[in-house]
Amino acid sequence: MVISAEKQTVILKMAADFNFYGKRLRATKLEVCDDISKMVYDTTKHSTAICDWLEANKPAKPKAAKVAKAIKNDERPEAAGIVSSTVEQWEVKQGKRFIITSIQNNTFPHKNFLASLEQYAQFIGADLLVSKFIYNKNGFQNGEGADGIRYDSAFDKYICNKNVFLNNRRFAFMAEINVLPTADYPLSGFAETATALNLEGLAIGAAKITAESVPALKGEIVRRMYSTGTATLKNYIQQKAGQKAEALHNFGALIVEFDEDGEFFVRQLETMDESGVFYDLNTCATPAGCYETTGHVLGLQYGDIHAEKLDEECAAASWGHGDTYGLVDILKPKYQFVHDVHDFTSRNHHNRASGVFLAKQYAAGRDKVLDDLIDTGRVLESMERDFSQTIIVESNHDLALSRWLDDRNANIKDDPANAELYHRLNAAIYGAIAEKDDTFNVLDYALRKVAGCEFNAIFLTTDQSFKIAGIECGVHGHNGINGSRGNPKQFKKLGKLNTGHTHTASIYGGVYTAGVTGSLDMGYNVGASSWTQTHIITYANGQRTLIDFKNGKFFA
């Protein structure tokens, strides 16, 4: 079939209109040619010939005109490399106090929070340092490559572009690190970095507030890692990663202060709303200024107590000793939260089958459960304050007493030092059962009725909720999801919690975990350890911070 030149032009135009060359299948192309044949020849019998002709005469695509590239002066070196680590070149910024945070490119500041940070930095004589991170650099006007990256000018005088040490070479602000705000765990991989660089502490700028403790060999310092939170608004790509991250965005910063020995103390600063207001200990920072305040601390959760193995120095700094004041007297919290108050050392299920352990307890005069109870009760008595209600969160070590009393293999006839107490407490348990008293707590009973201690604490039961400022404080952390072992990372799915159990201070999402008030060496923690003596402060606005005990104090 011969197609005239006039009809060829018409057929090519119609093929373009019907996207003939965009069809992959021959059958689909023939359907298009049926329509073309009908319109050009008033019959479909020429569709095959038209299809063959179109395939043989596909128009060539016009070549795009080449745009001449602008010639740039490339000042990059041809090669580089050093033998020593760059850490040796990091500047040491002098000063006693620093406030550090981060900002995102092409993003407005949280103006009130920035104003509060500036006010607080001036109030305490701190340097304000800001690191930068890049995200979604092509999502803004003129955003092709580095030329489109902008940071709000309000931060210009605070920008820190290089990794620096603060005060001394033990704590580093790694301001060069670019951590995407969508990262689930901003500190992932930096534990090895801290160890390799011999850093005792490090902080990186990130949109999330997190904290981790790096395990150390026995007798060595547990390294601490922090991410700052950010002083810029939420600005995320509304896809899966962005929407996940947006929900966990923290308007936050860290205060890092140093004592005369160069020891660092870090606390989290976070504003919970558009006001920009935040607390640090007894100071309230606002965009208009800072002032001392009271009645703003809802909760002080101590690191796990373990009364029989208590660190007396940490305890004295926490709730005082004799005529001395402790942290509780400074903060005056509405509630004190106590985890693992009782260690149950003398007959703990981990050791009571060991003849060597029992012999050591006997030789030390510590083989009586009653003595453990008295120690525990005395600790609770020393915590008593008129302004604060003590809450005992039921914990695995607290439950060790009832586990012993219900253990058919306890062989109490071979334990005369504890036989009378064993039977007395069991009698109380069975009496409560007979009375259908579901609220009976054998540890509470033993401390008050047997050990003769007087205190006004409330004992929670396992799974009993106790919330302050929307934060669950009734979970110790030993029971995980669906019968598994508890783990702070696992608890992220449960919302905002303050937990204990691990003796390892951390922040993962809405889960803050305290350390320990007891000794850092309890005998059974053999090998490397990430334990720290760390409490949790919860403010009335829902803001929280970890607070560490070092050098006999909680702050510089």
UniProtKB/Swiss-Prot annotation:
Signal peptide: none annotated. Keywords: Bacterial host gene expression shutoff by virus, Degradation of host chromosome by virus, Early protein, Host gene expression shutoff by virus, Host-virus interaction. Induction: Expressed pre-early in the viral replicative cycle. Expressed with a few other proteins from the first step transfer (FST) DNA. FST DNA corresponds to the first small portion of the genome that enters into the host cell at the beginning of infection before pausing. GO terms for biological process: degradation of host chromosome by virus; symbiont-mediated suppression of host gene expression. Involved in the degradation of host DNA and the shutoff of host genes and phage pre-early genes. Together with A2 protein, involved in the second step transfer (SST) of viral DNA into the host cell, which leads to the complete entry of viral DNA into the host cell. Homooligomer. Interacts with A2 protein; the two proteins form heterooligomers. Part of a complex containing the host RNA polymerase, protein A1 as well as another viral protein of 11 kDa; these interactions are probably involved in the transcription shutoff of pre-early genes. This gene is part of the long terminal repeats present at both ends of the viral genome and is thus duplicated. This is Protein A1. It comes from Escherichia phage T5.
